[in-house]
Amino acid sequence: MQQQTPAATAGDAVVIGAGMAGLAAARVLADRFARVTVLDRDSLPATPDSRRGVPQGAHPHVLLAVGREVLERLFPGLTAELVEAGARWIDVVRDAIVWQLGGHRARAESGIEMLCMSRPLLETCVRRRLQALPNVEVRAETAVAGLTGRPGERVDGVELAGGERLPAALVVDASGRGSRSDGWLRELGFPAPPESVVTVRMHYTTRLVRGRCDRLGGPGMLVAAESPPDHRRYGAAFPVEGDRWFVTLGGYHGDRAPTDAEGFQRFADELPDPAIAELLRGTEPVGEAVA
């Protein structure tokens, strides 16, 4: 678990947010700064449990080949730890039943694998490895109230909700869509960063289920996507630890899957390929659907 880091430069860095972006940023900064402090307003469970500050935690997550390789370089041994905890390898062509553009995609050995797991499992394993570094501290239940610095000149740290100030040579905001950095910067006399907004009218609902997929006969991926523009629905299923599957159903331009069990099943029944609907019928739900 212990990792060696090269000699750091003088100064501290502060990272706001202990999600995947914040954890990865902190790992890189640990090689360049004497001390890195990661702050998150959530409690951070020691076990793979969902938390309020990660709204996507209840939806599917996978590591594609290059992303996994990068994380493995940053956190040696991460892949083996995830697999030992139940993450599932799948060949993206051989182990996938994909209906798209009017037919099934051919299945064959590709040698291209992705690793499927729940977001809480991935985040927990990465955070544990980050916390093993001697110059990194992760502080849970710690809300940031604003930035500190010389107005119009520079940012030199953060102020916490309780009034404590943490000086920093670099502040990284990885707090996600709830970021307040634009307002904090304006309060210090800086212009807010330019913002680009792309409206995507896509909606999706996810249900976690437990059991086997008889159609695949093992871990694999199911995808059913209708042909645009006349049809707007899609569905996907991915295996994760604990003999469970994330099943996501969605649509575009106002077409969305219901969260109740009957409506969710009916939406799956209307997809062009029956594999996802069959998976739902042959498994048991774990908790409620999340939109």
Predicted regions and their residues:
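N-terminal FAD cofactor-binding segment of flavoenzymes
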Residues: 28, 32, 47-98
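A conserved short coil-to-beta-strand element within the FAD-binding core of flavoproteins
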Residues: 140-154
